[in-house]
Structure formats: C-alpha cells, structure tokens
C-alpha cells in the first residue's frame, strides 16, 4: 500500500513500480477509485485473483452472509477494474494463470477449480449490470451468451438495450417466434 510505495521510493525502485505498489489495494470498495497506472491495474488484478483462486483451492468459499476473506468484494474489484478501464481480457485466462502458479497438490482438479471460480464471477457481473440499471431480461440474455470478456459483456448489454427499443427488434422477435412455433410442430 502507501507505506510500500514510500519504501520502494526510498530503496530506489522505479517510480512506476512504487506507484503500482500503492495502487495494488485499489479498489477497496465499490465506490473507490481504480488504479491509474497500467502496472497498478495489473498488480491489483493479479493479487485479487490469486487470493480468490487460493481460497477456493483451499476450500474457503463465501456462503450466504459468510465471506471472511472478502472474496466477493475482491471479485467485484476485478470486474470494476476490467470494465472501468475497458480492458479486453479473458476472465478464464486470468483464472487459469492464477491456478498455474499453485502446486498441483494444492489445486487438485484444476479444471473443476477453474469452473468454480468462473461461476463465482457470474453473480458479480450480474450485480454490476443490475447496478448500471439494466433490466433482468437484458442481464439474462447477455450472461447466457457468456461473460468471459467482461468489457464486451457490458457493451453487449448496451447494444441489446439499443436494439431492443427499435421497431426492427419487434419485427425480428415476431419472425423468430413464428419460425420457432413452426419448428415445434414439425
């Protein structure tokens, strides 16, 4: 954090390294600022993903009101940083990279762990879309198409809303409904 930045400067570290050290705890909550530097952004995402993967690998997962390691907040922070900075990155690749840094005996079933962590992020992206004012049906539609790239998922939601409010959408929906009904009868 802040003291780490001061120590890094005192030890002659590059200014970007020192700044990344101070930014790696950001965001601390939903309304907090995001890291300003690319280095701080990468370090913060990596640190939070490492914590989430490590906890899931150890069998420590949030349940109901229990989240002693603030994993939901850390996942929401990852989502906020990726979306807020418009980063085009694969969530699955970030998870896989974090898993690769753990010994096999800790990870166990790496594929199963990756799926569990990926599914954990689904509710975070749903919450973000809901907080941005998207309706339930729009959220369902865009999440059903996948959310591996969080920035694209939010852009997809905006595009669905834009298209949904046009006459063409109604015509396409009617045509699809007719074709779907005919296919059921065949």
Question: Predicted regions span which residues?
Answer:
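Amphipathic alpha-helical "coupling" segments that flank catalytic cores
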Residues: 1-186
């Amino acid at each position: 954090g802040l003291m780490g930045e001061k120590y890094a400067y005192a030890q002659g570290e590059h200014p970007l390294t020192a700044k990344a050290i101070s930014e790696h705890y950001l965001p601390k909550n939903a309304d907090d600022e995001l890291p300003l530097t690319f280095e701080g952004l990468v370090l913060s995402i990596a640190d939070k993903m490492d914590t989430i993967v490590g906890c899931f690998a150890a069998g420590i997962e949030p349940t109901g009101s229990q989240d002693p390691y603030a994993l939901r907040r850390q996942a929401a922070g990852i989502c906020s940083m990726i979306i807020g900075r418009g980063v085009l990155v694969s969530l699955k690749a970030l998870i896989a990279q974090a898993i690769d840094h753990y010994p096999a005996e800790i990870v166990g079933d790496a594929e199963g762990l990756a799926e569990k962590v990926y599914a954990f992020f689904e509710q975070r992206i749903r919450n973000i879309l809901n907080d941005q004012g998207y309706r339930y049906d729009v959220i369902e539609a865009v999440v059903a198409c996948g959310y591996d790239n969080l920035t694209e998922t939010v852009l997809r939601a905006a595009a669905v809303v834009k298209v949904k409010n046009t006459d063409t959408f109604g015509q396409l929906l009617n045509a699809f409904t007719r074709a779907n009904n005919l296919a059921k009868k065949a």
